[in-house]
Amino acid sequence: MASQEIEQLASTLARLPGLGPRSARRAVLWLVKKRDTALPALLEALEGVQDRLVECDTCGNVDTQNPCGICADPRRDRKSICVVEDVADLWALDRARLFTGRYHVLGGKLSALDGVRPEDLNIANLLGRVEEGGIDEVVLAMNATLEGQTTSHYIAERLEEFPVRITQLAHGLPVGGELDYLDEGTLAQALRARRPVQ
């Protein structure tokens, strides 16, 4: 049986997304084994961001500076905005290094069941950014859920009054995916979005 402090650390780690009690205990044991190198580095990293984390006023990204590094980067294409549901989606897309524009984080998705309305999301700020001008394209990169598609449709309707191209991510078969393992919705979307062989 571990000490109360070690149990407290495991309990705290278990509250992180993706970590259950067993994974948290394994992480604690690893930290104990590597306490001379890993633990000080982890503490330093946590202390380094604890008081410096801010939400970007422009896009809603989380960073240690405001505006965030993406919004402040002069090499980014300022004429295109990719709209995502949350910061995790922004980070995933940016890791792929395929989109060179800037982002906009909604902070969620419309959901009648959860009582999330348009005014609960960061939509007004998006419309303000587009209204300022200089934006040629808005990419709607919502998840392929009913709520995500409802959110995309709502935003597309709100953007119709502006002279911008509105696009959305393609949905369908994942690379390496086998047809037998895919759900009917994914297969239907893949069939609807089929294109000529090149």
From Swiss-Prot:
Q: Per its UniProt record, what HAMAP family does this chain match?
A: RecR
Keyword Zinc-finger in the entry? The reply is yes
InterPro entries, alphabetized: DNA_Rcmb_RecR, Rcmb_RecR, Rcmb_RecR_Znf, TOPRIM_dom, TOPRIM_RecR
Name of this chain's protein: Recombination protein RecR
Domain (Toprim) spans: 79-174
The UniProt family comment states: Belongs to the RecR family.
Q: Where are the zinc fingers (C4-type)?
A: 56-71
Q: Which GO terms describe its molecular function?
A: DNA binding; zinc ion binding
Q: Which gene encodes it?
A: recR
- NCBIfam families, alphabetized: recR (TIGR00615)
Q: Which cysteines are joined by disulfide bonds?
A: none
The UniProt keyword set, sorted, is:
DNA damage, DNA recombination, DNA repair, Metal-binding, Zinc, Zinc-finger
| Cited function | May play a role in DNA repair. It seems to be involved in an RecBC-independent recombinational process of DNA repair. It may act with RecF and RecO.
Q: Which CDD domains match?
A: TOPRIM_recR
Q: Name one GO biological process term.
A: DNA recombination
The domain of life for this entry's organism is Bacteria
